[in-house]
Amino acid sequence: PILHSKDLVNWKVVNYALKELVPTDFYATVQHGRGVWAPSIRYHEGEYYIYWGDPDFGVYMVKAEDPAGEWSEPVLVKAAKGIIDPCPLWDDDGKCYLAYAWAGSRAQINSVLCVAEMNAEGTKVVGPSRIVYDGNDDVNHTAEGPKFYKRNGYYYLMFPAGGVQMG
């Protein structure tokens, strides 16, 4: 759902970015623990983008000029089992990147964060993935949910370490 608020206290559902989950034949029945995981919403050059990880199929994206308007059909940005929690970054040099984590339940690895270059439209990963953080040090285990920013010439990747299983 897409929610709107004028005061950050009272919220109203104004739309839904997805009409149905894809692949539709797979999601024709309820699939506990599957589907949309940890979406990120970003605004870039007049459009809103939502990226999410489906731990069984990969990273998807939809976009719209108006959050209350028509959203595009889902685009598979990167096909891979176990990729979750994606967050895009459009750099000021025109390049676009995707940060993401891994679901141990699907990929047999976790606590690893990666960044990959996408095409300028943000619709496809075009470069190799690079590990930018490995939390398998028994101190910061279960690193996930990265959020990617650039401010004053510096890149920031923020994420919870230790997991989110307790809320």
Regions found by a protein language model. Give the residues of each.
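Carbohydrate-active catalytic/glycan-binding domains of CAZyme proteins
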Residues: 1-167
